[in-house]
Swiss-Prot record:
Pathway: Amino-acid biosynthesis; L-arginine biosynthesis; carbamoyl phosphate from bicarbonate: step 1/1; Pyrimidine metabolism; UMP biosynthesis via de novo pathway; (S)-dihydroorotate from bicarbonate: step 1/3. It comes from Nitratidesulfovibrio vulgaris (strain ATCC 29579 / DSM 644 / CCUG 34227 / NCIMB 8303 / VKM B-1760 / Hildenborough) (Desulfovibrio vulgaris). Transmembrane segments: none annotated. Its EC number is 6.3.5.5. The gene is carA. InterPro entries: Anth_synth/Amidotransfase, CarbamoylP_synth_ssu, CarbamoylP_synth_ssu_N, CarbP_synth_ssu_N_sf, Class_I_gatase-like, CPSase_GATase1, GATASE. This is Carbamoyl phosphate synthase small chain. The keyword Amino-acid biosynthesis applies.
Amino acid sequence: MRALLALEDGFVLEGRSFTGPGETGGEAIFNTGMTGYQEVLTDPSYAGQMVCMTYPLVGNYGVTREDMESGKVHVEAFIVKECCKVPSNWRSEISLPDYLKRHGVMGIEGIDTRALTRHLRIHGAMRGVISTQETDPARLVERARALPSMEGQNLVTRVAPAAPYRWDGERPQAVTLEPGGCAWVGKGPRLVVYDFGIKWNILRLLAQQGFDMLVVPPSFKAADVAAVGAQAVFLSNGPGDPATLKDEIAEIAKLAQTYPTAGICLGHQLLGHALGGRTMKLKFGHHGCNHPVKDLTTGRIEISSQNHGFCVDIDSLTDVEITHVNLNDGTLEGFAHKTKPVIAVQHHPEASPGPNDSRYFFARFRNMVREAAGC
């Protein structure tokens, strides 16, 4: 089925829908990973975005429940050069086209993904529309221009939970907080995890470190954290512009004064704001599992998994030590407060997909909690 992709600057490409008729729009970006498409699709940080995969063949190993990073597909559309319709892998439970159809997400192939990637790299990520219904490119360009910019969008409200829950090792489990606080179930440090659109592998790795976790929505106040008797705080990844989360930033500023605190991706950006810094929009973002990062505390070079369109301005922070930098463009990838037990990284140490070079971050956080809180 013929499909058109139109960007706000007038750039138009023709392809074919492999998920049936429809029309959708969002910010067009590219991901440089060779594999890991299912983790990309189910990563809540991709909400509001149409993802173009630079690798030419996608879908050849199908989809399995084991590789999900959330309970649904979050991308607005999936753009590939060629989609494999008949996967070959013993773990596969469903084909990529059928999986996208099940979740009501458009997928298109036959697109010149090299041309699209080059255009976005030169001109920057931008709004776009995909349609099988509208045949006039000029009308689609106008529809793309009418979409909201990623800057100024609070997309956390689309993906964050409405109520606290626990992680049972495989799926979230609802929990009701008692008026007197929280009935912790484990023996490890009591950790409140803020879910701004969390990837499940973060919860898996925190559990491996022995934390007794309560996962909470962004609306959970610092006073609520104290009421449940938490000993540490973790801030997750998530989508959209971090500067829009002003209420959450104010609460995080209070938490960072009291608890050992760590953040990943959006959590890193929110901590940056809470410590007096600012964020800025990257031209085309960092999306993929092959981004080099240097840990300045050890001198070690890591290949990291990344997915962010915003970053903390490295010159805007005071009272922190810069711990990680991106070797492609020199942007900030991690910091630690000079006097408080606060650490954060912009990249994704939990990977999924990607290498495990940065997984030590979770052990580093566990050791920090042990030293700061004595637990």
